């Protein structure tokens, strides 16, 4: 087994990142989606598939209904998820899963059944020789080259904060909110509706996601930015739709990600903001470790890619933290792949060899072994 390269798969709610242990970046990055035709094929004799996965579904989205098997970090549709894993191994990476140990990732505080079922499918459907399921945020810290810090990981389905001290996560202080990229996309669609631009179908929501990813940023001072947006056209940017129409996006560019910082005011959701989530997680930890955590706030995940988010989080945390503490927010440029890179690093360590759940472990103990071996 040692001579076979480990396959590292970061199953995001929105994007799958997959590749080989020891490499710097994932070889395959594709949307975690399955597209099924809305209508029966009008092209007689043309061989049209009944479903498309990943990039192909994205390209043909105009005639498809788009399904996401993972919602808020939890796998909701196991049949579709199996298809995505199948696509990952055989099409994207071109490997036989029964020849490679596999590392999968998941969000903290997921239902136990989620990781048990993942384990069962990997051993029984894909016959992997060995498996490990790692918590996403812990891997992000590895990729930042640290063993102590608090990770704020915001992806497409879930945002979570995980304090880690000397390599151990502090479970009682871990927190998560169901507010992440996909919710921002829905909110962006709502803001665009105010302007008279209506996006409703699953394919149109993909356009909204693209607008959000390309044009949004986080304002350091939201009120000042709003005032400025009423007085001038500084923030206006054009976006060309697939049909050639051009729409103008103004203050929605920063109103959308503001949802992360003010869920209640922006969209009536009684959820913790990302600054409260981070601050409360730190406060839940022992008083002796808090300073180290404040000095190592690490951002990870695609929803932390907005310009200005690091500076804004720093400002919000500084307002809450004791004055004597020098708060530091670390935002590496390729943090959307931080989880994957951490998995690649972790599995290349010689000390990791004893961590795997082997096929024998699984046959002997069943899927519940995952709770004992993967902490």
Swiss-Prot record:
GO terms for cellular component: cytoplasm; cytoskeleton. It comes from the Eukaryota. It catalyses: ATP + H2O = ADP + phosphate + H(+). It is an enzyme of class 3 (hydrolase). GO terms for molecular function: ATP binding; hydrolase activity. It is found in: Cytoplasm, Cytoskeleton. SMART domains: ACTIN. Keywords: ATP-binding, Cytoplasm, Cytoskeleton, Hydrolase, Nucleotide-binding. Its EC number is 3.6.4.-. Belongs to the actin family. Actins are highly conserved proteins that are involved in various types of cell motility and are ubiquitously expressed in all eukaryotic cells. This is Actin, cytoplasmic. It comes from Sterkiella nova (Ciliate).
